[in-house]
Amino acid sequence: MSQLSDRVLSLTRFRAGLEEIAVSSVRADVPLLGDFTSPTREPDWGFLLACASALTPESNEGAQEAVLRVAQGCLRSSQSTDEQRAAAILLLDRVGNQPAIALARDRDESILASIEANSSALVLDALYRRAELTVTLPSGDVIEVNPFQKKFWELASANDWVSVSAPTSAGKSYIIREWMLAELRGATPARLVYIAPTRALVEEVSEVFRSKLDDSVGVHTLPWDPEITGFERQVFVLTQERLHLLHQRLPQFTPSVIFVDEAQKIADGTRGILLTQVLDEAIRRDPNVRLVFASPLSANPGVLLDSASSHECKAAFVGETVTVNQNLVFVNQVPRKPLRYSLSLVYGGNEQDVGEIELPLAPDVVGKKVPLIAAAIGGVSTGNLVFANGPAEAEKFARTIFDALRDDPAIESDAVEELVDFSKGVVHERFQLAEFARRGVGFHYGDMPLVLKAKVEELFKRGKLRYLVCTSTLLEGVNLPCRNLFLRAPRKGPRMHMPMPDFWNLAGRAGRWGTEFQGNIFCVDTSDVKAWPEKPGRRKRSSIMPAATMTLSDITRMIEYIDRGAHKADRETPPELESSFNWLAGRFISGGDLAGLYGVTLRVDETDRIAEALGRVTPTLRLRPDLVKKHAGISPMSMQRLLDAVLANGQPEELALVPPTSDDAFEEYKTALDYVAEYLGGSFEPESRRLSLARLIVHWMRGVPLSVIIDNRARWRRNQGQEVSYPKLIRQVMADVEDIARFEAPRYLSCYADVVAQAAGILGRQMEVDAGDIEMMLELGVPRPTDMSFISVGLSRATTRAIAEFVLDPFLSPAQCTAWIENVDVEQLELPAFAAREIVAQRQLFSERRWRAG
């Protein structure tokens, strides 16, 4: 922070003015009781605008926040003059906040006339600054950017490796996608990879690319896509798991650029280690690959610029651009008045009294506080996001808000009715979302089908859903801004209180840039130390510590793990040890070189000690070396023990997986899970649960609708004399599909299948049955390559399976599936309404891509 910034921000009169603006802005957004609605003293806009003007050249967060606070406060004030509002617009111009200017003009068209009437040197200065804050695209088009976006573009254009960090609302996603689009539209062929932490973000990002690019550019999200090699220009939007699989399927795959979104996830356990591993493999294949990282609120983005690399052109940057003001508000019950809650704004390290609200009902349990407070403050307005600790709590919160809004009329909207129909068709007719949506209330958590979550997000952004209850999936990078965010005792996982860096990442969703001037974060029961062991205060940045670095920081522990036999992870053995061992063993077996590992800096003596330990155990492996690298995260020693067990059985052909359509599939997959649980690991305990999981896995691969799987489990429970609660049952089935069928089962069963196949080869046995691509069938929940092709071009699993009876060829390519969608007469098919709508919508997208191609 510069001396000028320090001097201006330390002015008592200026600080007091900022506090007045902040308190007034919250009061304007909240339905306070009558005693607290009297107008506050109007700030001295002339003085505040002058101070803010002096701060516009400053790049630090405090100065940026103050400039934005003054400008937006002035624009929202009913008592500021035309000249003052014009000056406020000029402030926004000087800091490159064009969306806020557009919003102000939309709300008050007279502002433009005020600027023209008050033309001065300030106007010329703002125009000069606006010209500075632009980027010229390869097409010659010019886009307006903010200071962070301008800096990113300059660094990415001049360096091979770049790592940036900025607040959630700084426009990272937009500028990075524009930069990638520019790379794809350049003069030379380009192959780009966008690594996203979740499948939800994969879908969101890939849709953006498809909407911006013509069909001469390949946009791929699946490693099984047979048309991957058919484009000179292509972008792959993948999770680290899918990129790893693509590496194994295409040994010569070498992208020119890899972008890692939400790069702080490199610190998250085994998935963080896998992210490090796929980056290491990409660099091993092509040392000249360009890497770009982006993370929110990271203090040390430079840690991702691997010091062991030979690249000299590197740059790290911590951006502090503020685009939307955020108000942190504490909400606590007024003593002896259970219906009344006091609000206090945290600003400048102090709590400022805002006023009181009254709830329609007194919460009879703690779990009703947040939804009732949200309903009291949000009313019929849009953009209300409510945080819940888990799927069950999310549905309960949504039910409470739904009940609190019982006097409000139902929302009459075709889009809402389509969501109702879709949720019943894709999940189950008893899924509660269908009921709540008609009153403008939705919920969203990780285990819900991807396409349904996307539709919920879309309706929330459009204001058709006024309230959305979400879990920590919001921390995974999904772009879902809001006007108000409500939360109490937020957790990360089932037990751990949410760390402050994660809280601020979540809080960054408050404030819809270009839609609202500010966002509000309402923290409930902050006086309860059990709910809030650490009260939120000033926004904090976190330090990134890659999981691989953390695990290998204790070399002795790793060597002891190897010498003890490198068994599967359990209560005594962290899974990070097993994952790191797999990575190191794969590197060692394939070339023996552990030098230059990406993301890990080891001393020569440490590298030698690990190599010696690996040298003691790897000669005992009869396992094919390629299987070690292929099955990331699984101990090679565990694979060897499985191989020994299959060889001891003597009949590997009898243990081979069968196609999911086989009549004996349930029993065969149960046997496979028995072997997996004993030798490889996974969440397949207790043994009594494995037949149920085998049935789930087989049904999922067969493409059985989720509703049928749910009804089958309900029927089984009734036959066992157990009661059935549909909300709970639906959540359990969706969790099993996501956690077991789509994540753990493909990881472990594909490894099992490969080991069994090797055993058969050793014994000279013929494998009579080909089960197909287990990983594809499990992750996508479909049995045929044709189904995969339909999904790869944009259809959901539900629609893909709905049309399966009309598409008999099991081996259609994506191009053939595209042609089918474009030519089919949906009115001639007996399809569910949601499936027919999706096909028509996809056809329109294809048409738009061809139109862009000219």
Residue ranges and their predicted role:
Residues 88-149:
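Pre-P-loop entry segment of helicase/translocase ATPase cores
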Residues 124-136, 142-143, 148-150, 154, ...:
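Conserved C-terminal RecA-like helicase domain
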Residues 242-249, 453-458, 468-483, 509-518:
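SF2 helicase motor core recognition
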Residues 280, 289-400, 442:
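Conserved interdomain linker/interface between the two RecA-like ATPase lobes of SF2 helicase motors
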Residues 287-292, 480, 484, 490-542:
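Conserved segment of the helicase C-terminal RecA-like domain
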Residues 512, 517-612:
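C-terminal helicase module of SF1/SF2 nucleic-acid helicases/translocases
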